[in-house]
C-alpha cells in the first residue's frame, strides 16, 4: 500500500496506525535516507552530499534505497510506502520491482483535506511552537508543491482503480476508522480481521 496526503494532513500519524493495525512496516523514504546517512553507508554518503548541496535525491538513488528496504524480511508480507513514489519514473520503477516478484499494489490511500483548513492548522501550530520559519507563505508554497508533484501520480492510481480517498480532517481515531473501513471495503482487513477501526 501507499499513503499520500498534503503536508499537515496527519499522514505520519495515520501511517503509524495503519502499520500497527495491519502488521506491516511503515517505509518512509525520509527515514531510509536518514538511516543510511547515520550508518554512513555508501549510498547514505551520496544522499548526504546531494542534500547538503540543496539538491533533490535523484530517482536512481531513491529507487536503489527503496529496493534494498523492500527486500528486508519485515516487508515480505506487505508494507506501507510513505513519500514514494514521487515521480512518474518512480511509479514505473515500483511497478517493475513489484512485478518481478509477482506482486502488485493493493491500495493507494489518499488523505484528502481542505487546503485552507490545513494552512490555518499549520500556521497556528508554527505560532504555538515559535517556528518563525514556518510562515503562512511557506506553508502555502509547500501545499502548492505537493499538489503539483503528486497530481500526476494520483491520476495514474485513480485510473488503475487503486485510489482510496479518505477525509483526513478530524480526530485521529475517526480518520483511522475511515481508512480502516475504506480498506475493508476492498477486502483488506486489519490483524483483528473484523474490519473495525484499529485504535
Swiss-Prot record:
EC number: 2.7.4.3
Gene3D superfamilies membership: P-loop containing nucleotide triphosphate hydrolases
Chain segments carrying region LID: 124-134
SS bond partners: none
Family, as annotated: Belongs to the adenylate kinase family.
Annotated function: Catalyzes the reversible transfer of the terminal phosphate group between ATP and AMP. Plays an important role in cellular energy homeostasis and in adenine nucleotide metabolism.
HAMAP family, per database record: Adenylate_kinase_Adk
Record protein name field: Adenylate kinase
Protein's gene: adk
